[in-house]
């Protein structure tokens, strides 16, 4: 007797995804609902989903940022491939967009109780972008960055709600991730930059989460928010795509009374196997002349990246690596102060201002990698593992013709391990639950060796140094987190979360810390308007003191006496807000926030002994900081014109401080209710983007013209010129660092940027980018590093 077994053969579903103007949408997600099957579109808008079980009914959906999700019903039949094409209508209703910044796991934006800003690949693709901080400045309410002071410089201090990823601000940190891996930050005395090793052309999207209410699951050093950068994967189509960019840069250098010239070249190649694997590789090289008198060396940078993405059964494996090299000479950043020396009679100015520039320079190498593995048990249950490393090696060599050499080398390493699982379940016709739980661990170390020697060598050993100094420090953070979202009829979302963590910094155990979180969002409709009301409360992780703050150190000009009794910074806060959607083409976001910071850490030079050559200082805890404000954002489309704007009001003041508020020495600086220095009272941005259509069959892509106007409001600060008058002009009495006579208000200013990009053919485009048209120079924070003047960049983009 023969037994016949029939096994149905799977089928293939393919098609294209375009917008309502007929243009392909690159990176759109197409998926079969209720399954783990899906794919992303390539540069032609094409997708393919293979090995789909036959003889079944499915709902297939296409989703793309800035467009309305579309779903279709299909039936598969053995031996018959299916073609399903989608045309997505542009829409500002983004409630179904998936974000991961708040909870690590994927969750729709409608369930988020805190505001999340998403910057899509489309935003980055249609206009020339130099660095990521420029994008964030215009797109994120309450966010801004200081203007760069050197060519090619990416700001390491992008500010959110008055807190910053930079140093010197007692308002916590912004934690930055790339593909799930935490970057080195100021907790390790490293300057992370926002994109000093990532080419903006390699970015797929950026998610920004503001404040402690949404960042509690991320633990320490994330008090002010999260910036999560996702880089591109390859295309699973069998096409190989090559991109080239050539750019020329001209930067005004007022100090030199000349222009600084630069050039940039970018190459990338992506492709893969349509069924299971893809790759993406590329590099970016830039050379810029200095804008200040230097020792003849340019600023050189090289960035290289690579990624491989593979699908094996129900698991997706994504491996990425990046490498960055850079070098530059020494500049005289005191050069323009010589003008003040003459004009303001600074006859007591330090003699070293007139010293000739030293030979040598600085160089760095920054490698990193990430491994992301996602495995689906069912369509509603998956696990994820992230393993990665961010490193940096820095070398400083400085020597004069008739004296010895100064030498400094620093090595940083940070390893990240994050494992979680995500589970969803429908428990009744009205209720759904969404649970994420996991563990995260980071291990960081920093080794610093400095000294001087008499002779110049290519390789140095410990015994070569005359006055060697070695610092070896390590940090560890271990956290366990969980978050539950209860959904009632897809309208009411209740979020409950908690992180429990331990921190050990430079050998000191800061114990166990708990970070709870509560959130609520409610969706309603009035006529044609959708309203999302939201409220959130959270207590962020601690910010332990940095080694440079707690431990003593000494430089050529100053002495830090150290303060081992520093307490970690803490933060909590709440926010209330609403998102209003008027049809597909108008959106308004309003948020009020109230955040309390405790034990902020800041530099205190008031202990300086004026009779000694070197300046003495230490770091202290500064009591309470109360940070309140409003954030407003709006977007609309009027024909081919896209308009977006945001405006933030920031009221950052000192609260209770028993240490300083009873001391008349600090009057005007730390009084209860007094505004903090260097925090603008308001920020804003207006962006107008006109989409230019293609004018011939050879140029269907068209292009864009954008005008960006950024506004920084009035801010309180020190009159640095008056302070130096007191130090260097013998006819002016010296001022203490905290003299209230130094206080002033810096006027508001605007920064204007014009960008243009047009595809002459479907394979070639030209672009022009003019930054800082108003030629504003901001000296409110440091008169030795004024902002750059007008910067012009022009070039050519090719796709092959």
Model regions and ranges:
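Outer membrane beta-barrel strand-and-loop segments of large Gram-negative receptors
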Residues: 266, 414-418, 473, 563, ...
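Flexible loop and strand-edge segments within Gram-negative outer membrane beta-barrel domains
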Residues: 276, 288-297, 301-375, 382-383, ...
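Gram-negative outer-membrane beta-barrel transporters
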Residues: 596, 618-716
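Short acidic/polar hinge/loop motifs at secondary-structure boundaries
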Residues: 47-50, 181-210
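Outer-membrane beta-barrel transmembrane domain signature of Gram-negative proteins
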Residues: 254-270, 349-372, 406-493, 524, ...
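Short, acidic, small-residue-rich periplasmic hinge/interaction motif at the N-terminus
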Residues: 18-23, 28-33, 61-68, 77-125, ...
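Conserved C-terminal beta-signal and adjacent last beta-strands/turns
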Residues: 268-270, 284, 309, 530-531, ...
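Extracytoplasmic beta-strand/coil segments of soluble accessory domains associated
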Residues: 134-181, 205, 215-232
């Amino acid at each position: 007797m023969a037994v016949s077994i029939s096994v149905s053969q799977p089928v293939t579903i393919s098609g294209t995804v375009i917008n309502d103007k007929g243009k392909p949408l690159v990176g759109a997600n197409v998926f079969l609902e209720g399954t783990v099957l899906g794919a992303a579109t390539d540069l032609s808008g094409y997708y393919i989903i293979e090995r789909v079980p036959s003889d079944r009914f499915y709902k297939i959906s296409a989703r793309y940022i800035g467009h309305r999700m579309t779903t279709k019903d299909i039936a598969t039949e053995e031996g018959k491939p299916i073609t399903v094409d989608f045309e997505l209508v542009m829409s500002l209703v983004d409630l179904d967009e998936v974000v991961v910044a708040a909870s690590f796991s994927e969750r729709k934006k409608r369930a988020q109780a805190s505001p999340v800003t998403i910057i899509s690949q489309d935003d980055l693709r249609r206009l020339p972008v130099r660095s990521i901080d420029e994008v964030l400045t215009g797109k994120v309410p309450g966010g801004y960055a200081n203007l760069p002071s050197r060519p090619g410089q990416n700001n390491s201090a992008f500010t959110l709600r008055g807190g910053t990823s930079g140093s010197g601000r007692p308002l916590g940190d912004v934690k930055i991730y790339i593909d799930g891996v935490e970057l080195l930050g100021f907790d390790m005395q490293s300057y992370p930059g926002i994109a000093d090793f990532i080419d903006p052309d390699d970015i797929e999207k950026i998610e920004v989460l503001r404040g402690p209410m949404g960042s509690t699951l991320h633990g320490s050093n994330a008090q002010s928010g999260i910036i999560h950068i996702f880089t591109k994967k390859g295309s699973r189509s069998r096409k190989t795509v090559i991109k080239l960019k050539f750019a020329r840069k001209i930067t005004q250098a007022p100090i030199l009374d000349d222009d600084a010239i630069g050039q940039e070249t970018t190459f990338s190649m992506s492709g893969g196997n349509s069924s299971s694997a893809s790759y993406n590789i590329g590099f970016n090289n830039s050379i810029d002349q200095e804008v200040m008198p230097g020792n003849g060396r340019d600023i050189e940078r090289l960035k290289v990246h690579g990624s491989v993405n593979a699908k094996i059964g129900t698991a997706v494996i994504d491996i990425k690596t990046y490498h960055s090299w850079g070098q530059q000479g020494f500049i005289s950043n005191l050069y323009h102060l010589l003008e003040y020396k003459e004009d303001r009679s600074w006859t007591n100015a330090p003699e070293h201002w007139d010293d000739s520039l030293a030979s040598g320079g600085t160089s760095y190498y920054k490698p990193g990698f990430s491994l992301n593995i996602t495995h689906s048990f069912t369509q509603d249950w998956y696990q994820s593992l992230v393993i990665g490393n961010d490193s940096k090696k820095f070398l400083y060599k400085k020597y004069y013709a008739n004296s010895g050499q100064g030498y400094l080398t620093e090595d940083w390493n940070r390893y990240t391990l994050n494992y979680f699982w995500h589970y969803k379940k429908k428990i009744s016709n009205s209720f759904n639950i969404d649970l994420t739980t996991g563990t995260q661990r980071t291990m960081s170390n920093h080794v610093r060796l400095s000294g001087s020697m008499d002779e110049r060598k290519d390789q140095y050993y410990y015994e070569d140094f005359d006055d060697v100094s070695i610092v070896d420090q390590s940090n560890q953070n271990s956290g366990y987190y969980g978050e539950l979202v209860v959904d009632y009829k897809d309208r009411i979302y209740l979020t409950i979360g908690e992180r429990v963590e331990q921190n050990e910094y430079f050998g000191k155990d800061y114990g166990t810390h708990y970070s709870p979180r509560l959130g609520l969002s409610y969706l309603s409709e009035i006529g044609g308007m959708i309203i999302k009301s939201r409220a959130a409360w959270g207590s962020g992780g601690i910010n332990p003191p940095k080694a440079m703050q707690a431990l003593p150190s000494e430089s050529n000009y100053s002495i830090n006496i150290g303060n081992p009794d520093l307490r970690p910074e803490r933060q909590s806060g709440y926010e209330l807000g609403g998102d209003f959607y008027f049809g597909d083409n108008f959106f308004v976001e309003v948020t009020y926030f109230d955040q309390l910071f405790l034990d902020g850490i800041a530099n205190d030079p008031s202990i300086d002994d004026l009779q000694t050559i070197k300046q003495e200082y230490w770091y202290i805890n500064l009591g309470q900081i109360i940070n309140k404000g409003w954030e407003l954002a709006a977007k609309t489309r009027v024909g081919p014109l896209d308009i977006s704007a945001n405006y933030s009001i920031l009221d950052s003041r000192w609260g209770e401080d028993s240490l300083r508020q009873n001391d008349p020495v600090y009057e005007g600086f730390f009084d209860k209710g007094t505004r903090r220095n260097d925090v603008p009272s308001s920020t804003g941005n207006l962006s107008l983007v006109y989409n230019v259509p293609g004018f011939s069959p050879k140029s269907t892509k068209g292009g864009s013209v954008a005008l960006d106007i950024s506004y920084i409001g009035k801010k309180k600060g020190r009159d640095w010129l008056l302070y130096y008058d007191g130090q260097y002009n013998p006819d002016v009495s010296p001022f203490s660092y905290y003299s209230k006579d130094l206080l002033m208000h810096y006027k508001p200013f605007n920064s204007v940027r014009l960008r243009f990009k047009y595809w002459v053919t479907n394979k070639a485009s030209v672009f022009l980018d003019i930054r800082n048209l108003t030629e504003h120079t901001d000296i409110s924070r440091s008169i030795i590093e004024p902002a750059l003047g007008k910067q012009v960049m022009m070039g050519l983009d090719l796709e092959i």
